[in-house]
Design a protein with these regions (language model features):
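Serine-hydrolase catalytic-loop signature spanning alpha/beta hydrolases and amidase-signature enzymes
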Residues: 8-12, 32
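Short, Asp-centered acidic motifs that coordinate Mg2+ and/or phosphate
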Residues: 2, 31, 104
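Short beta-strand element of the alpha/beta-hydrolase
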Residues: 1-9
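Glycine/threonine-rich flexible loop motifs
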Residues: 11-17, 42
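Active-site-proximal cap/loop segments of hydrolase catalytic domains
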Residues: 35-233
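Short amphipathic alpha-helix adjacent to the substrate-entry channel of hydrolases
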Residues: 16-35
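Amphipathic coiled-coil/heptad-repeat helices and related helical stalk/stem segments
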Residues: 3, 18, 147-151
C-alpha cells in the first residue's frame, strides 16, 4: 500500500525531505510518494501557471495520473491520498473525479467550498485569492470554472473511499464549516458504507493545536487511520 501526498497550488514546491514519523509507515511495508503536479513549481514557473485559474483542473488530472502510474508500474497496490488546505481541495476534487482509485483519503483543513468562499469578498483572505483562482464576482467564466471543480459543489451519488477530514475551530484561513458542510453533503449523497470521519479540533487553527507534542498526536492519529484502512494495525 502507498500514501500519496499532493498540494499543487500557489507555486509551492513539495521538496522531498526526511521524516522520522513516516518511518512508522515504511516499517509496516507502506510506500510514501509525493506527486509533483501542476500548480506547484517543481518543474519551473510554467508548471505553476499551467495549474491555476482556468487551467486548475490540470492539478487534479495530474494527481489522478500519478496514482494510475503507481498502480500500473506495480509500485503500489491500494493507495491512500493525503493533502491539506489547498491540498485538501486537491483531495476533494480527485475523489469526485476518480474515487474508485483509492482505498482511503485524508483531507486536512480542506479548502472545499471554493465557490462560496471566493464569492464572499467580506472574508479578509478572499480578495488576495482571486489571483490564484479567479474572480467569480466579476467574471462569469471564472465562476463557471470554479463551480466545475469545487469539491462541495460536485459531490455525486457514488461510492467514496474511507475518508478522514480534519478542521480547526479557530482556523482563519479555511473556516471550519467548509469541512463540516462537505462531510454533511458526502454523508447525504454517497452510496457506500465506508467510514467517513470529521475531526474538528476545538483548540486549533490552520496549522493545528499549539504545543510541543500536539502535532505528534495529530500525526499519530492520522497514521493510525491510514494503517487501519489498510488492515495494518
Amino acid at each position: 500500500p502507498t500514501l500519496l501526498y499532493g498540494y499543487g497550488a500557489y507555486g509551492m514546491s513539495m521538496t522531498p525531505s526526511f521524516s522520522v514519523a513516516r518511518l512508522s509507515l515504511v516499517d509496516r511495508g507502506m510506500v510514501f510518494a509525493i506527486a509533483h503536479i501542476r500548480g506547484g513549481m517543481e518543474k519551473g514557473r510554467q508548471w505553476y501557471l499551467d495549474g491555476k485559474l482556468k487551467k486548475k483542473k490540470n492539478t487534479f488530472k495530474d494527481f489522478v495520473s500519478s496514482a494510475k502510474f503507481l498502480k500500473q508500474s506495480k509500485i503500489s497496490g491500494d493507495i491512500t491520498i493525503h493533502g491539506g488546505s489547498a491540498g485538501g481541495l486537491l483531495i476533494g476534487a480527485t475523489l469526485n473525479m476518480a474515487p474508485q482509485l483509492f482505498k482511503s483519503a485524508v483531507a486536512d483543513v480542506p479548502f472545499v467550498d471554493v465557490l462560496n468562499t471566493i464569492l464572499d469578498a467580506s472574508l479578509p483572505l478572499t480578495p488576495p485569492e482571486w489571483e490564484e483562482w479567479g474572480n467569480p464576482i466579476l467574471n462569469k467564466n471564472d465562476f463557471l470554472n470554479i463551480k466545475s471543480y469545487s469539491p462541495y459543489d460536485n459531490v455525486k451519488k457514488q461510492a467514496y473511499p474511507t475518508l478522514l477530514v480534519t478542521a480547526g475551530l479557530t482556523d482563519p484561513r479555511v473556516t471550519y464549516w467548509e469541512a463540516a458542510k462537505w462531510v454533511a453533503k458526502l454523508r447525504e449523497l454517497k452510496t457506500d458504507k465506508n467510514n467517513l470521519y470529521l475531526k474538528t479540533n476545538m483548540e486549533a487553527g490552520h496549522a493545528g493545536k499549539a504545543g510541543r507534542y500536539h502535532q505528534i498526536d495529530e500525526v499519530a492519529f492520522m497514521y493510525a487511520f491510514i494503517l487501519d484502512s489498510h488492515d495494518l494495525l
